[in-house]
């Protein structure tokens, strides 16, 4: 019963709690144990469900024929560049917010729609911070490609979720089912902290990006080992 408990789906949690208490001869009226076990099993099943939702979004390729995808891309531009209109859909202007060429769709190949959704979420919920970081990214010596780095950090957040490293963080953030919102919030933390880290480290050039990205990755993994960790900008 206990071994199976960590694999239950959300609708089965209540029954599983009763079964465990019966198996271990724990009084059903012991509400403290019952509540804690219920929350723990919800968190475990919720983590798995969140990963599946994130993975499904990652698997959706950016489609320039999809109106919703295009609207999100234009929204990203408008959030970051409110005083400058796009002259065309295919334009070198996209490089101004850190895409590699004149059509951002090619930059989303690795992380699919998840990369765009993350970028839009940060720009929408932390607009001032996003514009400030975009400004930092244009630094003459320490500059980097804002959107490309943002998508790279989506991959970091995704891999940490996939390998289970985000469990303590998410269990501390929400006593129940973690939602996509909580993944986005962690992503926002990564973007904000990476920008600080990059300028503190002062790399010689963007050519050393992978080296410093890995150093930042190790720093985050170290923080996530703390069982009391909460890594959000709201915190």
Task: Please describe what each predicted stretch is.
Residues 1-235:
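Extended acidic/polar regulatory tracts at the flanks of large eukaryotic scaffold/adaptor proteins
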């Amino acid at each position: 019963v206990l071994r199976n408990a960590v694999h239950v789906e959300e609708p089965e949690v209540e029954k599983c709690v009763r079964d465990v208490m019966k198996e271990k001869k724990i009084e059903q009226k012991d509400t403290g144990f019952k509540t804690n076990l219920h929350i723990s099993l919800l968190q475990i099943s919720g983590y798995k469900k969140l990963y599946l939702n994130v993975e499904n979004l990652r698997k959706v390729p950016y489609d320039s024929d999809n109106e919703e995808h295009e609207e999100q891309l234009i929204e990203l531009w408008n959030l970051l560049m409110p005083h400058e209109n796009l002259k065309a859909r295919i334009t070198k202007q996209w490089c101004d917010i850190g895409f590699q060429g004149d059509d951002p769709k090619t930059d989303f190949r690795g992380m699919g729609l998840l990369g765009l959704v993350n970028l839009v979420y940060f720009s929408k919920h932390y607009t001032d911070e996003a514009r400030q970081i975009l400004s930092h990214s244009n630094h003459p010596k320490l500059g980097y490609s804002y959107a490309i780095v943002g998508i790279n950090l989506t991959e970091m957040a995704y891999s940490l979720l996939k390998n289970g490293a985000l469990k303590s963080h998410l269990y501390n953030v929400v006593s129940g089912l973690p939602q996509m919102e909580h993944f986005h919030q962690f992503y926002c933390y990564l973007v904000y902290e990476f920008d600080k880290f990059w300028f503190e480290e002062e790399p010689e050039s963007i050519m050393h990006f992978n080296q410093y990205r890995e150093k930042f990755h190790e720093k985050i993994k170290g923080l996530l080992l703390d069982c009391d960790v909460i890594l959000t900008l709201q915190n």
